[in-house]
Amino acid sequence: IERPRKFALTLGFATALALCMAAPAPVASSPSVFAGTMAEMTYIELEAATRNGAVALWALGAIEEHGPHLPLATDVYVPTAQLLQVQQRLAQQKISRVMLRAYYWGVNRVRGSFSGSIDIRPEVMTELMTDVFRSLSKAGFKQVFCITGHYDAAHSRAIIEAVRRANRAADIEANYVVPNPLAFRLGLKVGDAGFILVGPPANAAPARPDLHAGQAQTSLLLSIAPDVVRSEIMPSLKPTDLMPEEVEVWRNGYEPGKRIT
């Protein structure tokens, strides 16, 4: 953009922002992005929760391409909905719990070549998680349970490193709840400290797995957030049906993975 136009755009944005900050217009009522999470609590309420032995729950997702029919935040919607259900179950069992706002700047190697896929360096994510764990410990939490909605192996390895660091430092008892097929890919085993393996056995995966933005994820989004699914284009979409050797190329990501998709 030529300099005068760029200056005009900058000035226009700054002016608009100043006006909005001075007198924000009323907005239509809609669910808060912080609904059900620690962010809506006061510090007094949080202190009371930790004194009552509350456990912390944390969903770790990513902003990532999910085909032409699902939103970039698919991997955030799903684990958030799962933890909201977990909260309800824990409430029924009289277990005190606090849910953190979902993390969504993930490590994105597999789909990183697509527009909208935000890729964070693993060490940056690990350091951020380490700081969050330390802050939770200072707030009085003794345990935190993490889940992911984003199955990129590099993303999970960043989580694994953060969990191990927290447990070595004894800042907080950190736990990563991992589906068995993902745990197998990551080399995790039952009994590994800090890791809880759940779900079907690793060898239960079909020869042509429903990897990404397919029937499983689409069904989940239709169940928890139907308004964000572009249902009108779904009938025109064909599954990729990748063979095992193609899946390996896909998992390596970047341009080869994009082409095979």
State each model region's role.
Residues 8-22:
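Bacterial N-terminal signal peptides
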